[in-house]
Amino acid sequence: MPSESFLKKIMGRDLQIMENDADMGPEYGDHADEPEIIADFTEYSPFHIGHRHCMMEAKRRVPEGLFVAVIPGPLERNGRGLPYMMTREARAAIAIRAGADIAVEGPPMGVMGSGQYSLCLAGMFRALDADWIPRGYRPIPGFEEVLRRINLGHRVVPRPHRIVDLDKGETLLKGPLEEDNYVITSLARALGKLGFDFRGKFIFVERIGGVSGTEIRRAVSDGDLQRVAGMLPPETMDVLSEEIEAGRAPLHDMRLEDEIIRNASEPGMDELMDLNLFDEVTASALIRGRPYMTLREVEEAIPPSFSRHHRQRILSVLEAKVHKGLVHKYIENYPSVIRILGFKDKQILKEFKDRIPHRRLEIWQ
């Protein structure tokens, strides 16, 4: 099990990265038109056979393309606000070994709302000048029409308990969406907001069965990797074993509990309201619930919200004490730098640098 000091070091470093990135603006310049860029946002927590299936299908359809894996991100918390199993460096290493050409850093999803991180991802696709965007989806009745409208370039957006085509003024689907499908519509909305023409750019790949991220994480927590070996490619098994041996994994059961308890217990109303994702209801509830002795007490004091991930995201915001102003500035300039977490070889790296319009690139050290 990694030490608390290891996690504290990551948090401190990543908060500084966010602050530095927020203070810079992106730079754009001339670029080559080829090869085509396949930009895939996937959290890889961990990379399983479903992820490999989506990657291989995209590479099959665009055999000469450069496959760029966009891997979140600073603070190492996922879109649901939960800790990742491995650092983004390790997740990038798996992606490259499994077939990606380039891996770049995505946004700090765990301390953002879905609308915020979707804007960041859309900004990254624009900065990469993405030709293709592969996305896995789960088939449900009526969703094929949603996908068709998106690939026509329509502004298809998620609303509470329904999906709406704004261009046609039609409700396409009613009821809550499964997470993978929700991300597709949220991303399409964000791309439209930024004026990115996504007509015909999505490669929609039906998810394969027999894979459970929850089961994988539970098996890793139990120290029984072999129980889920059929769900994981050998590249994931190898890197995960290396990370565990080095004391850098698993991270998905770890929180900086003392920081969360302190930041839930001490700040006044104004200071809490300055934290990202906090509203008056959440801040007031945390103040009423004091004092706190355990992480569970803090979690139970956080009121429910429209998003079922609200509690975990709030815990992640408290953990790193992430302020609204920082996040807003970060989103405004994102990506101020394309941070390269891994690459296949030097020739691929040169092709990538020549191809994308963003001129400020940094290789992760």
From Swiss-Prot:
Pfam family of the protein (one): HIGH_NTase1
Coiled coil: none
Family: Belongs to the TmcAL family.
Annotated protein name in UniProt: Uncharacterized protein MTH_1126
